[in-house]
Swiss-Prot record:
CDD domains: MECDP_synthase. GO terms for molecular function: 2-C-methyl-D-erythritol 2,4-cyclodiphosphate synthase activity; metal ion binding. It comes from Shewanella denitrificans (strain OS217 / ATCC BAA-1090 / DSM 15013). One of its GO terms (biological process) is isopentenyl diphosphate biosynthetic process, methylerythritol 4-phosphate pathway. Pathway: Isoprenoid biosynthesis; isopentenyl diphosphate biosynthesis via DXP pathway; isopentenyl diphosphate from 1-deoxy-D-xylulose 5-phosphate: step 4/6. Its EC number is 4.6.1.12. The lineage of its organism: Bacteria, Pseudomonadati, Pseudomonadota, Gammaproteobacteria, Alteromonadales. Its cofactor is a divalent metal cation. This is 2-C-methyl-D-erythritol 2,4-cyclodiphosphate synthase. The keyword Metal-binding applies.
Length: 160
């Protein structure tokens, strides 16, 4: 069986009047994230990881922020498109591991809902999806509550 690993990383700054959407879930918070799309930093990192595993570039290549067609775009639609590209190359998700790096908001109440949506969008068992959160102990931009960073790692396996 052929395996491929992909790593994704994304950062967005807090601001604006959009709702805060993380992993497809609307998370109650004072502000959303500044972005051309809906700003779902979790789904952007995962999309990048999938594209990376497939050697297909990054989300900026597929959904440029210079294209008005993607203004306010639903990142779940973008994620499903990236996953379809992997399926077209006969690869499917083996597992996904996501780390949300944020001082705020607290992620624990939202992790299971995020896992459920990811399992649905990636057509996989929830046991193949892990989402965890950490802080930077008040260090750096995430520690100062200026934004959120996310890392994602995927293992893609050749579909049989």
């Amino acid at each position: 069986m052929k395996l491929r690993i992909g790593h994704g990383f994304d950062v967005h700054k807090f601001g604006g009047d959009k709702p805060l959407i993380l992993g497809g879930v609307t998370v109650p918070y004072d502000t959303g994230l500044i972005a051309h799309s809906d700003g779902d930093v979790v789904l952007h990192a995962i999309s990048d990881a999938i594209l990376g595993a497939m050697a297909l570039g990054d989300i900026g290549k597929h959904f440029p922020d210079t294209d008005d067609a993607f203004s306010g775009a639903d990142s779940r639609v973008l994620l499903r498109h990236c996953y379809q590209l992997a399926l077209n190359k006969h690869f499917q998700l083996g597992n996904l591991d996501v780390t949300v790096i944020a001082q705020a908001p607290k992620m624990a109440p939202h992790i299971e809902a995020i896992r459920q949506l990811l399992a649905l969008d990636l057509n996989t068992d929830i046991d193949n999806i892990n989402v965890k959160a950490t802080t930077t102990e008040k260090l750096g931009f995430t520690g100062r509550k200026e934004g959120i960073a996310v890392e994602a790692v995927v293992l893609m396996q050749q579909a049989i």
